[in-house]
Amino acid sequence: MHWTSILSAILLFCLSGARASPAKTVIRNKVPLLVTNACTRIFQKVTWEYTSKSKRSSPVCSYEPAFQSMLYCIYETLDEKGYSNKTLEKTFSTIKKNCASYSDALQNMTNSEFYDVLNNGTRHMTPYVKGSANLTYPVEMDTQLRKAYYHALHGFYANLDVGNIYGGIICAYFVAIMAFAGVLHCMNYTPFKTVLLKQKLVGYVRGYLTLPTIGSKHASDFSYFRIFTGYLPTRLEGIIILGYLVLHTVFLAYGYEYDPENIIFKSRRVQVARYVADRSGVLAFAHFPLIVLFAGRNNFLEYISGVKYTSFIMFHKWLGRMMFLDAMIHGSAYTSYTVANKTWATSKNRLYWQFGVAALCLAGTMVFFSFAVFRKYFYEAFLFLHIVLGAMFFYACWEHVVSLSGIEWIYTAIAIWIVDRIIRIIKASYFGFPKASLQLIGDDLIRLTVKKPARPWRAKPGQYVFVSFLHPLYFWQSHPFTVLDSVSKNGELVIILKEKKGVTRLVKKYVCRNGGKTSMRLAIEGPYGSSSPVNNYNNVLLLTGGTGLPGPIAHAIKLGKTSAAAGKQSVKLVIAVRGFDVLEAYKPELMCLENLNVQLHIYNTMEVPSLTPSDSLDISQQDEKADEKGTVVATTLEKSANPLGFDGVVFHCGRPNVKELLHEAAELSGSLSVVCCGPPIFVDKVRNETAKIVLDKSAKAIEYFEEYQCW
């Protein structure tokens, strides 16, 4: 078990012992509770001929005339509103709960005894005269006053309840979207998907709204002054996020029922501050389950919808930002409330207040260190801080509401976290902890091969696993890698590692110290992610480069073995690489394609072909040309050397012309699926060019599958 799981388990243990019995969230705006509390408040303010030695006392619970007056107030209010005796009897239970801390005498009272008290009080009931003091008899309150108290409490309680309802709707919004995505995902495995893609309206929607990036960036980050960096959603993700933001804004700003007479609160300002504080606080906590679910590896919505983990991380970020905004509004509004109510001096010393301040500070720190610049350059530090601060934030939030309400949102988030960790442990244990062979290839690549477990275990093309290298210096780290089935030895997995910062650099140093070839014990957890369903398309174009080769190569091998029988007209794999070291790492898999029904084109971007005057004049025979940004691209006439040693591959120098490749594929008869995984700029280029092709050929079934993942 990784150190993060251990830390979180300790946190859960602390939470379980934090308080003996956390306060449950109840629906407050129910008639029995509402009318009982309204009448209780009325008669708490009356001066009775009542004294008590106990500091905790209430005349409506302990002094019979006050108790009779409250019962009659409840009866009259319910009678005016047309409620039956059944509702009246529910108020008896509410009275018992309210008075449990003040009087034991009421706890064993039967409904008949409550009616006897009510009838006895009714016979002696006297209209209340304002200013009366030391009352020894039951009194009847003015109807307008009763209605005013009822309305005031109704607005206050409704605001608390509706916050939870709105939070539930936000959760349901994302679940509904993922359910709809799941329906579309299931259609990928039926002929209906290609029929749907041929509809012109669908093509226009996809070409303008769902496929393209916002601007020209999604996988690649935007940057201002090298400090303000980040990642933009796709247009579809942007639409979903916009819908969420609209919902959230409406839920935060709409539906308040203010009391014009300010019966409960001292002024309109105090009332508004309290209502906004309560609403924003409840909405903040409603984000807990989704934030934990979307960050988890075993997200059931990912399995249902087929939506990539990258998209869920995008939603996770926006949910986190809005949760922090809600918390800021909650803290500011509640501070304003206590200042205006002149209770700040005492409130700030309360435990819930102090933990609320701590939670807000922790949330702000988490948001700050989640900026893309920290994730990009200091990922391990970011991950460590995110987990530690997240655990502390959970604890602070628990303590903040443990005696109030809202704990159920934390319960749900903890349950999601526990299920995720249990599944992760099961997956890692199922694979076992085998020894893997590691071989250094070139300067920065490592080919890792490991035996599969004896029991059934299968990873589809494009799926990935999380690997922990069980070395004393970095066993606690877990990193994702796309996996391939070995073509040279049955029952083996292949993972290609490229040296970067962090654990891959340490692993490379370890391999180098052992002569470039060694073994190491691993923990493998997976597989995760979904495989792009390309089998139902007549033509498949696989575009890849950089470290994104495993998925498309695995697709090519699988399609090459089945394409003839499945009626595939064309399977084309286009690989862009900087030098041939990466080809050496994948040589067994690429050599396997020689005898398969796959067109393999490899572009060496380190070699730039030379232009001749005749090339530039004759467009039909030119070897390469510059795209709109001046990037040199190559065509089939300018060849590079063939390091693989077989004739089933066409080598080019320069960069692939994405637009041209897509147009060529789109001209083929039948449906087309485009699969892309590679460097961020390359992925964004393919996505946007595919969107243009979909618009140009809106009556043709063209689908785009992106296997690029951002962690």
From Swiss-Prot:
Positions binding heme 2 in this chain are: 330, 400
Q: What induces its synthesis?
A: By transcription factors AFT1 and AFT2 upon iron deprivation.
Enzyme Commission (EC) number: 1.16.1.9
- The main enzyme category here is oxidoreductase
Q: Which InterPro entries match?
A: FAD-bd_8 (IPR013112), FAD-bd_FR_type (IPR017927), Fe3_Rdtase_TM_dom (IPR013130), Fe_red_NAD-bd_6 (IPR013121), Ferric/Cupric_Reductase (IPR051410), FNR_nucleotide-bd (IPR039261), Riboflavin_synthase-like_b-brl (IPR017938)
User: What would be one Gene Ontology cellular-component term for the protein?
Assistant: plasma membrane
Q: Which residues are glycosylated?
A: 85, 108, 120, 134, 341
Q: Which residue range or ranges hold the Ferric oxidoreductase domain?
A: 280-414
What is the role of the protein in this entry? Metalloreductase responsible for reducing extracellular iron and copper prior to import. Catalyzes the reductive uptake of Fe(3+)-salts and Fe(3+) bound to catecholate or hydroxamate siderophores. Fe(3+) is reduced to Fe(2+), which then dissociates from the siderophore and can be imported by the high-affinity Fe(2+) transport complex in the plasma membrane. Also participates in Cu(2+) reduction and Cu(+) uptake.
User: What is this protein's record name?
Assistant: Ferric/cupric reductase transmembrane component 2
Please name the source species.
Saccharomyces cerevisiae (strain ATCC 204508 / S288c)
Which gene codes for it?
A: FRE2
